[in-house]
From Swiss-Prot:
This is Programmed cell death protein 4. Pfam families: MA3 (PF02847). The modification N-acetylmethionine is found at M1. It comes from Mus musculus (Mouse). It comes from the Eukaryota.
Length: 469
């Protein structure tokens, strides 16, 4: 046994200086160093004692290192540590044991936000919570009597001239599409027109001058419905005064502006939004030629209304609102006037004024019937030229042209009862239209032809008489 201890001391020679660093720290190390030095110098200490001291010192260092982490259980650790030191067994501090520990390691948590109140973070109270009415403290130094019972209202600034035109132009253009005067009135009430109320009729009439007859009729209805709700009769009078003043400029874009403005004035007087003495107030005071022409037109229309003509028919009823019988009469008059004057452009203009592109097949039908009923070549050639012009200008579409010819093909047996030579005339006219490019080859081939009668004078040789039947 003594031999083994001597070998251990020889293998692990102990340096007194280094022993103090490896065994202890602080005051305990200093005290232990002095004792060990004395013991070593006395040559009576054993190797097992030195190994046990090393183990105990190492266990103490581990306990001190983990003391900051295990601050919450310092008493138990210190107790365990003292027991470990006495027993010579180290406290298990393996990494696996620390992973299974669910307590905080740094005292700051995992860095997640804390729950902020009953409704959670960023939520004001629980769902469905009703807040009390905030009571005003009279003793508050910032209390103001004017703040009690305040009623807040949205203030809309009045429109200037530029904003007025930009805002109202799309409103009136949309009105030409839907025709609802109530919707326009509601939109105008939301705007602060101020002194620009008289500009509404001016802008509406200016846009209607560039439109169709149906647009002018809708404008007259709009002015009649807005008067008394959005604007007054004085505003209407101011607007027509401005229109008469601006007629020279309006006539540059619309040459018929004086006559159209005169019709607007006559319609306004008939609707009761202009006084009957409005035209008389301008007598002898007008120097502008266009304004005088407008007033003269209004005077003529008003005088005609006294004889029985209604003032609400100055624009007629445009588009599909017209009855079919009325459209048939208008087209018949259009063709008769064309055969008398021969003016293709005027006939085309009158057809567009009817605003019934879905009814153009009636013109094709009536025109061909006139050709079948005519006795000379002039009507044949004039109707051919008219259809050719309307086809090239795309006034009459291919569908309307086809439908008009198909109506003739279906009714030719009845027409032939009144016009005996209708089949031969129709075949000739259809062939001429095909040569002019008005109809297609398929439509030409659909033209019906009546079987020719066999005359008694025809012999077995099959010779035909020179005249055709």
């Amino acid at each position: 046994m003594d031999i083994e201890n001597e070998q251990t001391l020889n293998v692990n020679p102990t340096d007194p200086d280094n022993l103090s660093d490896s065994l202890f720290s602080g005051d305990e190390e200093n005290a232990g160093t002095e004792e060990i030095k004395n013991e070593i110098n006395g040559n009576w200490i054993s190797a097992s004692t030195i190994n046990e001291a090393r183990i105990n010192a190492k266990a103490k260092r581990r306990l001190r290192k983990n003391s900051s982490r295990d601050s919450g259980r310092g008493d138990s650790v210190s107790d365990n540590g003292s027991e470990a030191v006495r027993s010579g067994v180290a406290v298990p501090t393996s990494p696996k044991g620390r992973l299974l520990d669910r307590r905080s390691r740094s005292g700051k948590g995992r860095g997640l936000p804390k729950k902020g109140g009953a409704g959670g973070k960023g939520v004001w109270g629980t769902p469905g919570q009703v807040y009390d009415v905030e009571e005003v403290d009279v003793k508050d130094p910032n209390y103001d009597d004017d703040q009690e019972n305040c009623v807040y209202e949205t203030v809309v600034l009045p429109l200037d001239e530029t904003a007025f035109e930009k805002t109202l132009t799309p409103i009136i253009q949309e009105y030409f599409e839907h025709g609802d005067t109530n919707e326009v009135a509601e939109m105008l009430r939301d705007l602060n027109l101020g002194e620009m109320k008289s500009g509404v009729p001016v802008l509406a009439v200016s846009l209607a001058l560039e439109g169709k007859a149906s647009h002018r009729e809708m404008t007259s209805k709009l002015l009649s419905d807005l008067c008394g709700t959005v604007m007054s009769t004085n505003d209407v009078e101011k607007s027509f005064d401005k229109l008469l003043k601006d007629l020279p400029e309006l006539a540059l874009d619309t040459p018929r502006a004086p006559q159209l403005v005169g019709q607007f004035i006559a319609r306004a007087v008939g609707d009761g939004i202009l006084c009957n003495t409005y035209i008389d107030s301008y007598k002898g005071t007008v120097d502008c030629v266009q304004a005088r022409a407008a007033l003269d037109k209004a005077t003529v229309l008003l005088s005609m209304s006294k004889g029985g003509k209604r003032k609400d028919s100055v624009w007629g009823s445009g588009g599909g609102q017209q009855p079919v019988n009325h459209l048939v009469k208008e087209i018949d008059m259009l063709l008769k006037e064309y055969l008398l004057s021969g003016d293709i452009s005027e006939a085309e203009h009158c057809l567009k004024e009817l605003e019934v592109p879905h009814f153009h097949h009636e013109l094709v039908y009536e025109a061909i019937v006139m050709v079948l009923e005519s006795t000379g070549e002039s009507a044949f050639k004039m109707i051919l030229d008219l259809l050719k012009s309307l086809w090239k200008s795309s006034t009459i579409t291919i569908d309307q042209m086809k439908r008009g010819y198909e109506r003739i093909y279906n009714e030719i047996p009845d027409i032939n009862l009144d016009v005996p030579h209708s089949y031969s005339v129709l075949e000739r006219f259809v062939e001429e239209c095909f040569q002019a490019g008005i109809i297609s080859k398929q439509l030409r081939d659909l033209c019906p032809s009546r079987g020719r009668k066999r005359f008694v004078s025809e012999g077995d040789g099959g010779r035909l008489k020179p005249e055709s039947y």
